[in-house]
């Protein structure tokens, strides 16, 4: 595939996994995610990687901070809201609604191995821990 062309809204809304990599290019990666009520992405930082998030359905709380232990900004987000997280900023997105939070994310450059599918957050955390070892 030379690139990716598709209905990103449909792709996002139909996704039932915690995280699925849809496309990986040399400088950009597209993933779709689904968070259960009360579930979060998990506080994280990407050194050298900018991240764009867009909520297609649901409501949540975005937390941004300069360090792992600091929340400097909190923002409520819902359908059609976007968030840009610059490289080096600690962040989390928590589903504060009663239904699934459906979103897609762009990483520049790519963050996850091409073809990654994490059915659950626990699976994603285990894979990330294995990468760190």
Description of each model-found segment:
Residues 1-31, 42, 74-78, 119-133:
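A short, N-terminal "cap"/entry segment at the start of jelly-roll beta-barrel domains
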Residues 67-87:
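Short acidic-glycine-tyrosine-enriched beta hairpin
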Residues 78-79, 87-113:
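Ligand-binding loop in jelly-roll beta-barrel domains
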Residues 40, 63-65, 71:
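Compact, glycine-rich, soluble single-domain proteins
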Residues 31-47:
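Conserved short histidine dyad/triad with adjacent acidic residue
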Residues 48-65:
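Glycine- and acidic-residue-biased ligand/ion/polar-headgroup-sensing regions
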């Amino acid at each position: 595939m030379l690139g990716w062309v598709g209905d990103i809204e449909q792709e996002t809304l139909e996704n039932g996994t915690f995280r699925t990599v849809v496309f990986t290019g040399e400088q950009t990666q597209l993933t779709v995610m689904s968070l259960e009520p009360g579930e979060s992405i998990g506080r994280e930082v990407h050194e050298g990687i900018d991240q764009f998030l867009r909520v297609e359905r649901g409501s949540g709380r975005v937390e941004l901070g300069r360090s792992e232990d600091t929340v400097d900004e909190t923002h409520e987000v819902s359908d059609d809201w976007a968030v840009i997280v610059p490289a080096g900023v600690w962040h989390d997105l928590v589903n504060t609604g009663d239904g699934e939070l459906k979103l897609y994310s762009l990483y520049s450059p790519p963050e996850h191995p091409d073809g990654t599918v994490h059915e659950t957050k626990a699976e994603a955390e285990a894979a990330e821990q294995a990468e760190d070892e």
